């Protein structure tokens, strides 16, 4: 009886050890390929994304190897043929829209997380970005919640092209009554709101009487200028909520201005999406509170929902 029990224990122990060994070998054999430009016009943005990705990766304690490939002036299809192999469990990148279009044409067989979005799509490719369309959707929800029926739009001269996509997205997503104005009104009628599109310096110059039911965009918020009291805006939450130590660590290591802080947060969320897929590759629906907003992952797409805030005069509060 004693020998039989010992034999049974020995078999169970060996089975557990075997499963652990298989798991370990699987982890060692896995690899994540990251395709980002190291030079060229997008290199600075890519550097901040990489900074955020690596900081979140290090904080997570994951050991899966990362393979970095420079995409500048290189054909994406050729890069995939050259670097994707049996160990590649996921591809992250590219960043440029033209490269994402090339990526879709190449029809990758490995799950891929592109870091920009284009008109086309493939089931195997998740498109993840800091999209103006998502910013517009968050703003639309906020305006509806506040009972706004007519939105006055004040554009800083020279900034029209910069905000055109957000404005067009807002027009297409909302049934509000829109009106372009050349200067801020002295007061707003009931159910009227004012949307300012411009930079922080121009925002600070708007008369105080107009601040009630006033809204703006994320790039009008600056560390150098205090926003008007009561103004509302939608942005990546990590800038206002200290809930992600990896982003703080990345910033302390290499301080950058607020626009690049958003890209650090974006890189951190890109790693978290990657980690989620590696741990649950068959999952068809996942949600988490990310550094750049609420992230919803389905089998074929990723949806990011920025969060909205209000400046109270002493600080920013989550709405």
Predicted regions and their residues:
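Beta-alpha junction/loop-to-helix N-cap segments that form part of ligand/metal-binding clefts
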Residues: 44-48, 62-121, 201-202
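Short, solvent-exposed amphipathic alpha-helices that sit
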Residues: 44-60, 135, 158-175
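Short beta->alpha junction loops
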Residues: 65-79, 129-130, 155-157, 177-186
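Extracellular/periplasmic periplasmic-binding protein-like sensory domains
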Residues: 205-268, 278-282
